[in-house]
Amino acid sequence: MRDFKPIVSFAVLCCAFTAAAAAQTSYTVTDLGTLSSSNSAKVAEINKSGQIVGTSANHAFLWSNGVMTDLGTLGGGVSMAHAINDQGVVVGEASTASGEMHAFVWQNGVMKDLGVAGETSAAHGINSKGDTVGVAYAKNVRGGAVLWSGGQRQFIGDLGLSGSGSTAIAINDKGQIAGVSSGFATNQGVVRAVVWLNGVINDLGALGGLHSTANAIDAQAMVVGWAEVADNSTAAFQWQNGKMSQLESLPGSVTSAGNGTQATAVNDSGVVVGSCVTSTGETHAVIWNNGKITDLNNLITQGTGVTLTRATGINRSGQVVVEQQTNLDGPTTRAFLLTPQPH
């Protein structure tokens, strides 16, 4: 499971598709709307029941059966939802009355504070058992990846570089965790995608560049994310059994430093979604089936009047959550649900 987390500045299935089927799959589009005081919504993740979480009007929301619900805060003015499990439990971060941002878990209408006074924290992923991962740090201290499980909080470590920090992004039902670890190596800052397997952190490497980020992990411990290549642009990757492989880009994709292709989510059939820069320099939402990339804008059955720019989640049924970003009338983001249609 899982979602893209904006924690690096550079910047889940019974539906097994073949490459041929991928070209024929079409989707209906549902506009998720916004919370009443906003014209913008960002979407994070979708569970097997089609429940969706994200952020609108600076508040975390849960979208279920066509209704968007404001999840509130921890006493402050801001909250963000980052993940939801198949039981409908939501995690994220929210401001307290004192202004600190704390990790939260929301269930059955109640938001619970996972944070500690004097620290900043965020929850980025949750599995079906309720095990939650994220980051916590005190003022002027680098963040440390955290696992909340069984009512206890545990820091799970980093790569041990000079000035190291780490963030856990996603966790599967086996307790395998994907995230990032940063620090300094040979006098330069480095951010690397990592996975914790049986409690041991593993550096996933890169694709000819220096940096990488893991965004999601599936039931088979396949990790997806992005990695720098030799020209400092970004390439989507999948990592499994010790090997990082580059995912293909759209034909003629125009890349530049810090820009290119990113994989943001994967379901348990290994279908990956994310974004890719097109031949005209626009960013489009994409899907990879058996390693083959398709622009999701070419698969929708009705005109939306918008360009889908990033896919952030995919569930077992193949439903995809996507965003459209525009600068018309100021920068706004709208969120949509794509539902695959039977052939």
Labelled PLM ranges:
Residues 2-10, 14-15, 19-343:
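Residue-level hotspots at or immediately adjacent to binding/recognition sites across diverse folds
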